[in-house]
Amino acid sequence: MSLDRPPLGMRLSDAFGAWAIRRLAREIVVEGIERIPKEGPVILVGNHISWLDPIFLACWLTPETGRAINWMGKAEAMRWPLVGTFLRVNGVFGVRRGAADLEAFRLAEGVLRDGNVLGIYPEGTRSHDGKIGTFRDGAALLALRSGAPVIPVAVSGTEQLWPRGALLPRRAARIQMVIGEPRRFTYSAGDRPALSLVAEQMRAAVAALLPHEYRP
């Protein structure tokens, strides 16, 4: 069952995460939270530069909107001691990367069918150089099958807060999140060329919100 309103464990986790991020980042900029609707299905699509990205989003968006974010995350992380428990408490369900994971796709469709918020990183992995990569078709297929609005979310600076391969976080000068306008896509879900087109339009919407150095 997907999450709508954040349970106590998620609220406590978000509060701790926000406290920790405020201590590490000298400046935090968040724009456009008001663009996330208070109810109904929503797909959040974003660029992925650090494993902290979903934590940053959840710690600011969930308290402000009162809505839990159900995340698609890598399946192997769900098996890590303590980390897997933390992820499940925070609405993450696993996706096997490199293959079509029908079970995860059905779970994602269930989140939207229940009228809840789904968060996806369509690149499928973190960027190695900070620049936004190619979006895979899965998020586009979910958008077309569900009819849910898609909201682009651009994050920058989190890769400095916790660099790839680092064991511990570092101080960061500035981290930023910009939330764009919602958009609905009306192509047929069975139209393969349309899937690639929608995926590229999603990517372009996120890229337009990013600082120039993060754009392709």
Predicted regions and their residues:
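A generic local structural motif
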Residues: 28-32, 57-58, 105-107, 163-165
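Active-site phosphate/pyrophosphate- and oxyanion-stabilizing loops and adjacent acidic/basic residues
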Residues: 18, 59, 140-141
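A short beta-turn/loop motif at secondary-structure boundaries
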Residues: 34-37, 169-170
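A transmembrane-helix-recognition feature enriched in membrane-embedded lipid enzymes
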Residues: 1-31, 38, 56, 67, ...
